[in-house]
């Protein structure tokens, strides 16, 4: 198994594990459709742009590095990178709240209305792209790509943890690190709270630059952003903020829901599709320099599948049609034409076909009576 898969699988287990605990204990009413969208929001497209980020970093390091750390103790290299990465993230995050083009990317993350671990993986397709300029300075200074990647995983793991809904205040750690209690304030709907506590791992950046907020209201003011409630379609949600920013104000409202999809059918489809995403990462990793026809086809079908799941979750018929095309197209191409016969691919693709046929037959799908068309 590729080392890249381990944190992704752990993330998936923790997201559903925490959601299960919150549901069973009654500490939070879980919107399972929202959990699926959070996992589905970035998906394979975000991975492509993460690969682009890694490629850019490697190119800058190989061509423009000053190699300042070549003769420095590894201890100082790692310590510097830990702090410099987090400093860069603080300003990345702060400017994503300040500049409209960057907010158009970051708003997808803040639209989540439930504070739990799944919110930690809710992102725009373009999140990795807008982060590139803030970290390339590390490549210029001479931080090797391998060190950058490990430090990135460490910091993103802390940020993921800081979205959990189970951890209480952490005593003296609250004075040094960003904790869930700090980050919860950042996700409150009121803008005065959202424009504070930008730090990723260390809270002292906020204290140093005047953006720290310790105040917790006696009653939580709710999470998310003002305005129309987002849909479950990642294509729409990742691009609509840019249309609004450009003044395309006649963006169509969400169409009426034609049916209600059960949480079970949506979760099953999301997990099966994510199984193929894991297979994609196992096969291709960060490699986007030697792209094959098969890699391109798999990427496009997985992206289409994530959009289709969003349509199904929103109760749209086109979502069912697109899902059927994707789930039948995958085995037709990869098994029928390209002869992929590995048991893993056969099993997951067979599961997707069964899922699509069950959905088409009406399993997990109930007509929305308010939108029932007359016969």
Q: What are these model-derived regions, one by one?
A:
Residues 40-55, 67, 71-228:
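Membrane-embedded catalytic scaffold of the fatty acid hydroxylase/desaturase
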Residues 2-8, 27, 114-118, 161-276, ...:
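Cytosolic/stromal cytosol-facing helical appendages immediately following the last transmembrane segment
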Residues 321-329:
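Central hydrophobic cores of alpha-helical transmembrane segments
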Residues 1-5, 140-149, 337-343:
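Transmembrane helix interruption/hinge and helix-loop junction motifs
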Residues 17-36:
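Membrane-interface helix-loop junction between the first two transmembrane segments
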Residues 2-15, 20, 287-301, 345-349:
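Structural signature of hydrophobic alpha-helical transmembrane segments
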Residues 25, 279-288, 335-341:
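Juxtamembrane "helix-exit" motif on the non-cytosolic side of transmembrane helices
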Residues 48-55, 330-345:
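Hydrophobic alpha-helical transmembrane segments in multi-pass integral membrane proteins
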């Amino acid at each position: 198994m590729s080392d890249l898969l381990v944190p992704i699988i752990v993330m998936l287990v923790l997201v559903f594990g925490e959601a299960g605990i919150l549901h069973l204990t009654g500490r939070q009413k879980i919107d399972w459709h929202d959990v699926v969208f959070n996992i589905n929001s970035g998906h394979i497209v975000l991975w492509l742009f993460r690969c682009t980020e890694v490629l850019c970093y490697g190119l800058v390091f190989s061509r423009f590095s000053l190699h300042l750390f070549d003769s420095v103790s590894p201890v100082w290299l790692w310590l510097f990178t830990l702090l410099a990465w987090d400093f860069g993230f603080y300003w990345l995050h702060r400017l994503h709240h300040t500049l409209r083009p960057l907010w158009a990317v970051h708003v997808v993350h803040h639209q989540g209305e439930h504070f739990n671990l799944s919110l930690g993986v809710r992102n725009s397709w373009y999140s990795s792209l807008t982060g590139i300029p803030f970290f390339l300075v590390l490549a210029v200074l001479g931080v090797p790509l391998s060190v950058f990647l490990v430090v990135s995983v460490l910091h993103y793991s802390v940020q993921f943890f800081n979205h959990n809904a189970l951890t209480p205040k952490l005593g003296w750690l609250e004075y040094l690190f960003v904790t869930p209690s700090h980050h919860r304030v950042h996700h409150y709907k009121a803008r005065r709270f959202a424009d504070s506590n930008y730090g990723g791992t260390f809270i002292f950046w906020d204290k140093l630059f005047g953006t720290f907020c310790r105040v917790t209201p006696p009653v939580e003011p709710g999470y998310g952003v003002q305005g129309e409630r987002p849909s479950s379609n990642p294509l729409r949600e990742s691009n609509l903020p840019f249309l609004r920013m450009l003044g395309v104000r006649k963006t169509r409202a969400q169409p009426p829901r034609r049916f209600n999809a059960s949480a079970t059918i949506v979760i099953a489809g999301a997990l099966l599709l994510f199984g193929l995403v894991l297979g994609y990462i196992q096969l291709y990793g960060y490699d986007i320099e030697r792209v094959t026809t098969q890699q391109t086809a798999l990427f496009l079908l997985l992206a289409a599948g994530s959009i289709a799941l969003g349509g199904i979750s929103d109760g749209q018929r086109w979502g069912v049609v697109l899902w059927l095309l994707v789930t039948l197209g995958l085995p037709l191409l990869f098994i029928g034409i390209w002869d992929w016969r590995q048991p893993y691919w056969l099993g997951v693709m067979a599961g997707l076909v069964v899922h699509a046929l069950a959905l088409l037959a009406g399993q997990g799908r109930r007509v929305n009576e308010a939108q029932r068309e007359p016969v």
